[in-house]
Amino acid sequence: MKKRWYDYLWIVSLTYLILGFFNILFAWLGLLCFFIPLIISIVKGTKGYCNRYCGRGQLFGILGGRFGLSRKADIPKWMKSKWFRYGFLIFFFLMFFQMLWNTGLVFAGAKDLGQVVTLLWTFKLPWHWAYHGTVFHQGVAQFAFGFYSVMLTSTVLGLVTMVLFKPRSWCVYCPMGTMTQLICKAKNREKE
């Protein structure tokens, strides 16, 4: 089967994670992974991003499938349940809004820039080598540290579930997938 350009988007996901090690401001590019799925689901009413363009899902598929890093076990029913998915979405939103709050505090001068990446919302990893100051306000860097934390945490969770279950198990409870699914359901209700 002939490969299409979007079959290589896993390279973009991997490159994004690598760039964040060298310059945290590249974390801003992750917003594309946030807005593009929403735009596609709002405009087209489909989960086209998840099914075709998600580089992270592709990366998990390659690592777990082609490289055999997955047990390929079925994901537990509770992880597929709407309660878990919606609960995880709410939890993710709370962590996202906390990140925005901290960014706002840095912009307001009420808090110093925290040059750390917080993994799994708990473990603060020093990341000072990835930021050397810029012409931008430190709040721009604070957002980058926070957003990279969210992206790295979701990647770690995806890798863990990839190893334990099927390669793309993360996709079952991915907050972006849950949001786009809700948008698609709402759009389909409008059509009726």
Predicted regions and their residues:
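Non-ligating segments of multi-cofactor redox enzymes
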Residues: 1-192
